[in-house]
Amino acid sequence: MSTHQRKVLIVEDDPAIREALLEAILSDGHAAVGAVDGAEAVRKFGVEAFDLVLLDIMLPVMNGYDVCRRIREKDRRVPIVMLSAKGSEIDKVLGLELGADDYVTKPFGLRELLARVHAAFRRHDLLAEAPGAAPVTADTFYFGAALIDRRRFTATRGDVATELTARELQLLELFHRKRGEVLSRDFLLNAVWGIDYMGTTRTLDQHVAQVRKKIDDTAAKLIKTVHGVGYQYIG
């Protein structure tokens, strides 16, 4: 992983939490910029370059979901880690559907959060700096009937192109390379989220569900669930 200093946008309306996050990122050797509401976050993201966004959901002016959507309109690759006291499955799924890469439920420990930030940096570096490690072709490959474009982060069926998040693309590439193999949930989590990932396998299941929707595999004919083990790409 690249060790250069990163720049993190921290979007949090609670002053105490925002200052704690700013201090943690600065102490970790990176630059940090704070935003107190959704509108300020969108404005700052539009004029400055960031390597990661820590994004609270319950924000004044514009909520975190709308901020995530606006950021993804400008940049499909920057890692977005959502922060929220709303820990229900539907809240997490909505965040992932909008393009978030991770979801941390409050209250959280700063060590756990930094571990997730480090993992997000590593995944981004592997995708951006080492494209030769994972591609099926230079830029595109087929997954079933969907054409996957690695540069544009899209899955296209016919004339309809659907955007992919970085993790969704990594999952598709991994399934494609391991076609026919039964891949355990632990293997997939380690390969895509990193060995220090502290979440649950439910996050993986949610991502696979989103991937299935985007490649029109809701009947699980391409990505088969192997109960008690993981998944298998049989396309």
Features from the language model and the residues they span:
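Positively charged, aromatic-enriched patches within helix-turn-helix-type DNA-binding elements
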Residues: 105, 154-219, 224-229
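A structure-centric signal for secondary-structure junctions around beta-strands
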Residues: 5, 77, 90, 137-138, ...
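N-terminal/domain-start alpha-helical segments
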Residues: 1-128
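Short, Lys/Arg-enriched segments at the junction into DNA-binding effector domains
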Residues: 6-7, 119-181
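Conserved active-site beta-strand element of glycosyltransferases/polysaccharide synthases
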Residues: 232-234
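Short, polar/charged, Gly/Pro-enriched helix-capping and turn/loop motifs at alpha-helix termini
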Residues: 78, 127-131, 218, 222
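Structural detector for helix-capping/boundary residues
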Residues: 48, 144-146, 151, 186, ...
